[in-house]
Amino acid sequence: MTRVCDIERFLYDWAPRDLAMPWDNVGLLVGDSGAEVRKVLVSLDVTEAVAAEAAAMGADLIVAHHPLMNCAWHKVQHVTADDAQGRTITTLLKNNVSAICMHTNLDAAEGGVNDALAERLGLQATKPLTDEKIGRVGTLNCEKTLVEFLQDVIKYLGCNGLRYVDCGRPVHRVAVGGGACG
């Protein structure tokens, strides 16, 4: 039997808690660590709609990127149906759905969010952008104009709009940073 704590441990093996920024709130945020898990819903955020979907599909666990209570200093003062967060937590608890969130630790982890961005853009010889390992910097396999590089960004990341200033310099070294990086 797989339990919530087993999945949390597996996720921490990939993206350790100590990679999270000090202000971040990661791990099991709602639910029972000992509960059995048969169905998991994966989501970017834990919203009212996601909680309702998890309940409707009979999920035992939501694994999300963004924390439900988004900062370590955000101490829940109340849980009521008067606001979206309260309704979300109430729905989860009523339906025995736990929620694990892996945020900046997943951004920083080897093979995590920033490595995925760098790989998608074809960056080579990547290394962490900061001491906290948030972001990555690497090189393209060949120089490109900014417009050529941005066409790749649109193509490989599915962007529908970009703002830029073309200084006429070729692009060879690129930094990427998802979420908390900037």
Placement of each model-derived feature along the sequence:
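Hydrophobic structural segments
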Residues: 1-182
